[in-house]
Amino acid sequence: MFAFRSIATTVVMVAASLASASAFAHPKLVVSSPVDNATVSAPATINLSFTEKLLPSLSGAELTMTKMPGMEMPPMKVAAKAAPSADGKSLIVTPDKPLSTGTYRLHWRVVSNDTHPVKGSISFSVK
């Protein structure tokens, strides 16, 4: 009887720890469009899909143009809006104006229910 209780207690503790670990998982980038280091026609939106539902008020992105063909230039911020998708697991970034030919970097910061911020970036070029 004692051995059964010990095994049952161990099973319950392992199950609880696995459940709590998944409940506090950080969001991870699953896929982006455009993908990192891609060369694309000017996208109307940049989509970042994550493993967790995002908290919109704590998640966002900043788009920067880092290179323009034939010109030396410092990085230049590009006006864009970031909003969650309908399912809450994607961040959709919409530039205010069509993107010009050049290279861009999108820095993102997202937060899910665990409230820990996760940051990253992707780069892409517009032909």
Swiss-Prot record:
Protein's GO biological process: copper ion transport; response to copper ion
Chief site of localization: periplasm
Subcellular localization, as worded in the UniProt entry: Periplasm
InterPro entries xref list: CopC-like, CopC/D, CopC_dom, Cu-Rt/internalin_Ig-like, Ig_E-set
Positions that bind Cu cation 1: H26, H116
A GO CC term attached to the entry: periplasmic space
Matches recorded under Pfam families: CopC (PF04234)
Keywords of this entry: Copper, Metal-binding, Periplasm, Plasmid, Signal
GO MF, one annotated term: copper ion binding
Position of the signal peptide: 1-25
Top-rank taxon, per record: Bacteria
Binding-site list for Cu cation 2: M65, M68, M71, M76
Family: Belongs to the CopC family.
Stated role: Copper-binding protein involved in copper resistance.
Protein name per Swiss-Prot or TrEMBL: Copper resistance protein C
Organism the protein comes from: Xanthomonas campestris pv. juglandis (Xanthomonas arboricola pv. juglandis)
